[in-house]
Amino acid sequence: RTPRQHVGGCLGHSFDHQRGYHPDPFYGGVMDVFRQPKYAYYMFKAQRSPEKQDRLFETGPMVYIAHEMTPFSPKDVTVYSNCDEVRLTYNKGGKTWTYTKPATKEGMPSPVITFKDIYDFMIDKNMSMRKKKQDEVFLLAEGIIDGKVVATHEVRPARRPEKVLLWVDNENTDLKADGSDFVTVV
């Protein structure tokens, strides 16, 4: 809970970058040096209103699982969402947990959601290697408002690489073919 004396806070720079005056890079941004969102980006995004707005930036309901599903990942699963409820499912036909946002408006508008003791890498390994059911191993978060699923996010463990997936990150802005434009390929 934030004390009554707290006036506000700020984030000095949103992107990781080379400082210029010091050899150590600045790693405190909500996006990395390639402008790819880090977990902090989604935590801040969850503080937005879930109402859709006609704006230049993303609006509306969101849910994001901040978990990598690796042998080194914690058992606790962290989820960021601005929805009233979040339902988390671990594996196909597996157990489901539900978080309901408290009615009181103290502190952050959308607190960080932690589902305790959910993930077990050995279950993942057993299903994938022994039972050959790697397609059934996942974490699925569903954001629910007024009893309806309005946002979803699914995370699957990384396997051996099969392909390279690239896309143009143009922020829905068309390129100009006069040679003066460039685009980031992610």
Q: Model-derived features: where do they sit?
A:
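Extended substrate-binding grooves/exosites of carbohydrate-active enzymes
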Residues: 1-149, 166
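Short, solvent-exposed loop/linker segments at the N-terminal edge
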Residues: 67-73, 172-184
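Exposed regions on extracellular, virion, or secretory-pathway luminal proteins
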Residues: 14-17, 181, 185-186
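Edge beta-strands of extracellular beta-sandwich domains
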Residues: 147-160, 167
